């Protein structure tokens, strides 16, 4: 008796569509997890440098390693670093920051303009570890959103934070930021950091997937604008893509994976991409890879001049 074979689903390039399969070997798992582990090392490393300097007096060449907080800090006692969004709020209150703070904001702004503004979100911000955990639990438990909210809402929150800074005379977002609260709790043992973290975790877990980082956080919105023309991008290799959709399942900002736009640009061009690298490690076809914008060439558009001339001849 002849058995009827199931037809193999193919992508637009004619290749069979393959699902991502987690390798069984430890080495294979580490290849999938290597960017995640590197991100965690950076996030925890930054917190450890703050903590070690405050609690244990860490020094390098007689200078404190990293003092201050995630809004304004000093590296090795002489390199100022400042959150440009926090500085912008301070300026809007009518105060003029110190020259060192302005320089620190310029350094950070330049760094994220090169690497991608939302690299901050995926590689430095401690809240990312909390929201990643809630996203993982949602996938495991099959939890659905309670309601929908436009991802552009964060830009509205961004504008409101700036307006409130003008009207109240204080840096509005810095007072309620769960990022600042968590940092103060971890490093100095004061504030409502764990309460803020719990609120973000429960909101993301039960109410809205990536609710805080992907829909509400004005700092993420600010850095998305900064990163629009970043040099570091994720290259998109159109001929190898089978449209399997595995990347969109794990991406915290799936709207950036517009395959038509990516094919036209040869890369994920949206400033909302966090450059977390999840799509890179999950792609069965190695379609997505980090690259520099200058080395990414958009696919050549077909020359329709001759065909148009034939039609009008």
What are the residue ranges of the model-derived segments?
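Non-ligating segments of multi-cofactor redox enzymes
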Residues: 1-266, 271-274, 281-313
């Amino acid at each position: 008796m002849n058995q009827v074979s199931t037809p193999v689903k193919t992508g637009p390039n004619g290749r069979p569509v393959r699902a991502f399969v987690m390798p069984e070997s430890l080495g294979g798992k580490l290849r999938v997890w290597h960017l995640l582990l590197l991100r965690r090392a950076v996030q925890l490393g930054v917190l450890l440098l703050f903590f070690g300097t405050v609690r244990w007096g860490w020094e390098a060449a007689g200078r404190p390693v990293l003092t201050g907080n995630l809004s304004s800090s000093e590296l090795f006692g002489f390199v100022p670093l400042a959150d440009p969004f926090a500085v912008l709020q301070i300026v809007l209150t009518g105060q003029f920051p110190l020259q060192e703070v302005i320089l620190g904001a310029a350094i950070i702004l330049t760094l994220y303009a090169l690497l991608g503004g939302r690299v901050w979100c995926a590689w430095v911000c401690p809240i990312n570890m909390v929201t990643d955990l809630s996203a993982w639990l949602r996938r495991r438990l099959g939890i659905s959103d309670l309601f929908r909210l436009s991802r552009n809402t964060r830009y509205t929150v961004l504008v409101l934070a700036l307006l409130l800074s003008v009207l109240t005379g204080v840096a509005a977002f810095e007072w309620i930021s769960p990022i600042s609260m968590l940092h103060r709790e971890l490093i100095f043992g004061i504030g409502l950091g764990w309460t803020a973290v719990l609120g973000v975790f429960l909101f993301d877990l039960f109410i809205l997937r990536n609710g805080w980082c992907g829909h509400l956080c004005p700092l993420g919105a600010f850095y998305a604008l900064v990163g629009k023309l970043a040099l570091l991008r994720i290259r998109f290799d159109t001929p190898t893509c089978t449209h399997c959709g595995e990347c969109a399942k794990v991406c915290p900002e799936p709207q950036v994976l517009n395959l038509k736009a990516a094919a036209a640009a040869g890369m994920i061009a949206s400033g909302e991409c966090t450059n977390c690298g999840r799509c890179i490690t999950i792609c069965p076809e190695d379609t997505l890879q980090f690259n520099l914008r200058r080395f990414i060439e958009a696919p050549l558009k077909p020359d329709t001049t001759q065909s148009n001339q034939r039609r009008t001849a």
